[in-house]
């Protein structure tokens, strides 16, 4: 016997089924591009490689650094003299929340950001911010930044060995926070802090020079998943005051705090300053600043697998792997491209080149996995 279904009920069931299908689709991955030249944050939808939202605010001045909180509810954006905090509950449509001024009157750039011990369920842990010009690192409680007039719980400065600080990372499985220091008129070095006690770690030594060359500028780095090794890029070049262009990535033994090996680049891949890692895939990705190139490094064999020429003069200003590990996004700054190149991590080919009238001087791409 046939059972007839009323038309109204049929329409309702069809609508519910369609909604269930839509809700089961993966959420779009979005990336934030810090466009320094236009003082903007541009939101990229990685499904289409298009810019879907543009953020501007009077306090967002020449942004070059930033970091998502693991809860994915906040994004801390560095700029000149100020840090803006954005509500990212809807990551594709962030909303300005507030401005923090760690040092009133200071016009230095807040470049390095780290969320220490932040959870995925609350806006907690610590937010570390490095000001490269005033050689200071500020440590706030994330919860305090939600209130009025927050003050840092600790400040690291020149007396603690901080000099032109740039990039911060938490070493996996330890309370160690590592910082690159990149003075242009001296050898750069790594410093380590204890994330709980807020003290400088001095054993076996306080500072580690990764190249011991004036103006070498250790820049961005990534840890192996077990925290045993750090892969350190170098930003120093003749244009920035170094006597020569840097041509090596240093591999640091994290336990002994010593340089294990230096990996040379080919002559056309100059100044390998930016690093990201695929912990499951066993690859380290490095972007060179001049004649921008993505260098694909096998972390197990400790050898270069591929050089991917991005074309143009440069500069390349970073490399960011999407959370699903399928694509790499590389900002290409002024004066040449002002674009974001997209590389397929499987085929190792350039699959897109993103441009926009507000994509001026991009300095960083951040995903929710950072």
Give the location of each predicted region.
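Predominantly soluble domains enriched in secretory-pathway, periplasmic, or organellar proteins
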Residues: 13, 19-370
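Bacterial N-terminal signal peptides that target proteins for export
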Residues: 1-7
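Cleavable N-terminal signal peptides
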Residues: 7-8, 18
